[in-house]
C-alpha cells in the first residue's frame, strides 16, 4: 500500500484478499486517481521460491503453531526498498504492538515519505525478520484478529486522510473528536 504526497506506503500480505481493492475505493480511491496518494498491495507469496508458494513454517528455534517465513518477507521488503532507493520505515501490525492513536497517524504522515505495513498471519511472523527489518510494531487494541490486513487498512486510512487534498476540506479532520485530543 502506498500513500502520502510524493511518498509511498506498502501493505504486504500473504493472502489474495481485497486489500488493494478496498483501498482503491471512495475517498482514498479518488485521491489516488488525482495522484495525491499512491496505495499498493504486495503479495508475499510472489516472493517465495517454493512451487507451492508456501509462506508459513514452524518458528525458527521452536515454538507452537506456524509463522510467516522470514525469507519471502525479506525479499518483498528488499524489493520495495530497492524500488524506493532507500530503506523504508517498516511497521508490523501485531497484537503485541503499541496501541495506535490519532497522534500516531499524524506522526507517520509528518515523519515519513514512505511506509511499509507488514500484515502477519498464523502465530505471527519470523522474529528474525522483525529484528532485521521492522522499525515499530503497532496494534489496534487488546484483541486478536486472524491477520494484519484489517489493522493495516485502518492505519493506512488514518494516515492517508491527513494528506492535504485527500479530504475536500481540511476542517473535516481538524474538527474531528480525536484531532486535538478531545476524546
Task: Show where each model-derived region lies.
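Single conserved hydrophobic/aromatic residue that forms the stacking wall/gate
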Residues: 1-6, 10-11
